[in-house]
Amino acid sequence: MQDKNLVNVNLTKEMKASFIDYAMSVIVARALPDVRDGLKPVHRRILYGMNELGVTPDKPHKKSARITGDVMGKYHPHGDSSIYEAMVRMAQWWSYRYMLVDGHGNFGSMDGDSAAAQRYTEARMSKIALEMLRDINKNTVDFVDNYDANEREPLVLPARFPNLLVNGATGIAVGMATNIPPHNLGETIDAVKLVMDNPEVTTKDLMEVLPGPDFPTGALVMGKSGIHKAYETGKGSIVLRSRTEIETTKTGRERIVVTEFPYMVNKTKVHEHIVRLVQEKRIEGITAVRDESNREGVRFVIEVKRDASANVILNNLFKMTQMQTNFGFNMLAIQNGIPKILSLRQILDAYIEHQKEVVVRRTRFDKEKAEARAHILEGLLIALDHIDEVIRIIRASETDAEAQAELMSKFKLSERQSQAILDMRLRRLTGLERDKIQSEYDDLLALIADLADILAKPERVSQIIKDELDEVKRKFSDKRRTELMVGQVLSLEDEDLIEESDVLITLSNRGYIKRLDQDEFTAQKRGGRGVQGTGVKDDDFVRELVSTSTHDHLLFFTNKGRVYRLKGYEIPEYGRTAKGLPVVNLLKLDEDESIQTVINVESDRSDDAYLFFTTRHGIVKRTSVKEFANIRQNGLKALNLKDEDELINVLLAEGDMDIIIGTKFGYAVRFNQSAVRGMSRIATGVKGVNLREGDTVVGASLITDQDEVLIITEKGYGKRTVATEYPTKGRGGKGMQTAKITEKNGLLAGLMTVQGDEDLMIITDTGVMIRTNLANISQTGRATMGVKVMRLDQDAQIVTFTTVAVAEKEEVGTENETEGEA
């Protein structure tokens, strides 16, 4: 026989319905905070239970077991351990920015130590926790029955400060989680007031007063872009970094000292992780790690080897350990019974609306209470004005009910007024007592009028909220603990993990690039160029050599007017005998695009440093180096080229320097760079030389009166001329003759300034290359033809040349002779 109490259900439907019920219960009633008071149900019940127990800051601490037992029995039937753990967290300075529970005893440590059992510890409400419950007995919030309908509990607390932002929240529900960072109380209150004063305020405006989270453990927030995104959308991520300093011991060794760790980081686990990294040789240079923390604060010491770089080790620790972490914003909270991801403005708006409701309900409660009391006093005053008649009625009545009815009829009193008259003691009949009653009545009438005015004027409600927030700020606000590192990188770049060292970058004529340690290569000063290296093919030579640092930036300018940027360490390191890597493997060059110039941009480059551009068609431009601070991986346009023009070269000009430009037809113009005003990166430029028809620019150099001007013609003739024969004139002229151009010597192949003691590398269009010393080239006048520098095969022409420091000659082992065919 089938049991009538059994109900047949579809298992699939029942599972769906039951799981949804369970999920919503966890989401709404356990894991997520309410946007109004920032509390989950367990925290709200703990505070309310402590308030009902009278465990206030002015009373002695009470056993934690008594508190958790009372909360569990009346409001939260989910086990005492979960209640105690929540209460412990509210008493930990490293968990809550402003602790809501004042704990007495062992409440754990930031090293992950657990709190003592609840039978050993004691607790009471903190002073700021009182502000969460203030006026709760004035009908400021709604109450509901508890789980067994024997008690009443609040759905939300009045919360006289925005606790959701001030103390933050974390929680994992079903299919969703919340992670809201804590903030500084004073800054958060200022943000609330700013919204109230200016409803059109933007997130950027809010960040002027509330710049970012303020974690109880301090540490550093790297950059503000992640904060802005999180405040704007409710989701985002920031980088938290330990506060560190590098100390130098008496013996000259360095040590890293950590005084603040990121929020919720266990420094004992960090200690263990560092030791493991050292043992696995993933980090080298650490000799010892010890925790010297005490009651005065955190001090975590990492000893460094004498020859190791503390900065590099520190950056590796940031990358590999929790000394640097990411905090992911997910500002999810319950609003109107629904879980929502909220922006900063939405959280502030919700709190303001809650406070308006609290103030209105409290004002209404106070008004009703004052009106009730005034009603009684009004009756007493009527009785005192007719005291003889009142006494006669009372004496003539056989019962209280008869006397009350007669008083109500005679003096038009209410039941409450007549009862108050009957309850009045004889001493209230004195004249002094009447004056007191009259005074109290007048005060109540004034209070009622004021309360009614508050209810009628929203601006007064807003002012009360702001005044009360100011009071909370005055009592409990403190200095910010977390420092916001504005403009700092959000993550570690590779260069932070690479020790800075001086290196040489070489670029060959055929486009091979490599990095060499300066210890292996005798070089010019940083920024020098043109020293011949080794490892290139017989038909190749080093055209560009730059002395730089692994951390400095190199700018690569192409014939198409584009610029690319690499850091020194991004160029592969090769030995002296290796030819290097094709530069097209590092830079996204077009098929017909080639590197014309490599410029080293040092970190300490002066503010008046300019890049001077010269094009084939005589256009020049002067642009500040700062314009090239941010360059995308695929390059940027360095100048706007017109028609079929192309970039000849780029010069790094600092201070007051002259420029000389040479043309194919043998003319040169010299002018001061200040004759070209500074222009933006995308500007086209101005005319530097007025070219004759068919003429083009073949070279440009910086020039001083101590230099010599070297010119080489296409048919192998060349000469050196002292710079003083080239007077400084205005920009845009046709130029002065710098070479006698004939059919015999050919057009100019190039022009450059030299010191006179360099070697010269010359290459022809057939691939033949020669190296010769400049001393072999005669020094002649400006308008002469020059001497034969290189014997050419029939129909061959010189296409390019560059100088090579003579100091490198023996070391490199290249003879002053023609190398032969490519």
Curated annotation (Swiss-Prot):
Classification via HAMAP family: GyrA
Tell me, what does this protein do in biology?
A type II topoisomerase that negatively supercoils closed circular double-stranded (ds) DNA in an ATP-dependent manner to modulate DNA topology and maintain chromosomes in an underwound state. Negative supercoiling favors strand separation, and DNA replication, transcription, recombination and repair, all of which involve strand separation. Also able to catalyze the interconversion of other topological isomers of dsDNA rings, including catenanes and knotted rings. Type II topoisomerases break and join 2 DNA strands simultaneously in an ATP-dependent manner.
Query: Which SMART domains does the UniProt entry name for this protein?
Result: TOP4c
Q: Which residues form the Topo IIA-type catalytic domain?
A: 32-497
Q: Any keyword Nucleotide-binding? A: yes
The similarity comment for this entry is: Belongs to the type II topoisomerase GyrA/ParC subunit family.
Task: Recall the taxonomic lineage recorded for the source organism.
Answer: Bacteria, Bacillati, Bacillota, Bacilli, Lactobacillales
Subunit organization:
Heterotetramer, composed of two GyrA and two GyrB chains. In the heterotetramer, GyrA contains the active site tyrosine that forms a transient covalent intermediate with DNA, while GyrB binds cofactors and catalyzes ATP hydrolysis.
Please report the name of this protein according to its UniProt entry: DNA gyrase subunit A
Q: Which GO terms describe its biological process?
A: DNA topological change; DNA-templated DNA replication
What's the source species for this entry? Streptococcus pneumoniae (strain ATCC BAA-255 / R6)
The protein's annotated catalytic reaction(s) are: ATP-dependent breakage, passage and rejoining of double-stranded DNA
Task: Identify the keywords attached in UniProt to this record, alphabetized.
Answer: ATP-binding, Cytoplasm, DNA-binding, Isomerase, Nucleotide-binding, Topoisomerase
